[in-house]
């Protein structure tokens, strides 16, 4: 199975297993840390510049953010299980077909999550018993942040696919770049433009966009994914969709 250029793909079925696992696991762990950094940066900067009420608002809704992010991460990681198995077995046609189905399910999930969460946000804030005086701040932040759920899904999906090909360094690089942009945009939107918590949320969405674009670009360089197949290979099959959901849902619940 070939790759295009320096795609970062690593065949983990050959070579020193201990070194392969270590070189794969370290960027994975660091990547998870940096992905959480978005909210940490928002909270620190908002608390320092906008004051106690804004800080309290972001701290209060943190559990909702982790709920959404954990669910998305779990689903996409579950999809990556089947992709990694087929990559290791060198089943190229099955690999393409699986990624096609996983992409379809990720798009559907992103749409459902975005619509459902944006509609249900006032109710969620109420369930959390957020103090009435900071609810508007909470909703201002969450509406902008969760309007970017499709981008959150895109990053986690492309990152999961890259990891399934043995490339855990690209998602880490994307996270580091995005985290730095997030800090810079936080300061610009809040200090210079005066956009408050909406600016902090928008900075996170833009940073996610950059991370998503970089991972997608790297994923598209993998040769096996650019080879053309017969049109029949791009038809949806309920069995394969069911298998991906079967792998994704338990991972999502485990992350809650």
Please give the residue ranges for each predicted region.
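Small-residue-rich packing faces within the transmembrane alpha-helices of Major Facilitator Superfamily
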Residues: 36, 40, 67, 107, ...
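Residue-level recognition of specific faces of alpha-helices
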Residues: 20, 36, 43, 57-63, ...
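Small-residue-rich hydrophobic transmembrane alpha-helices
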Residues: 55-115, 152-171
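Helix-loop interface residues and adjacent transmembrane-helix termini in multi-pass membrane transporters
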Residues: 40, 49-52, 86-89, 164-165, ...
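Transmembrane helix-bundle signature of multi-pass secondary active exporters and lipid flippases
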Residues: 28-81, 145-152, 242-256
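Short alpha-helical transmembrane segments in multi-pass integral membrane proteins
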Residues: 1-25, 83-148, 192-248
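Transmembrane alpha-helix boundary and packing residues in multipass membrane permease domains
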Residues: 28, 32, 44, 81, ...
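Alpha-helical transmembrane segments of multi-pass membrane transporters/permeases
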Residues: 106, 161-184, 202-205
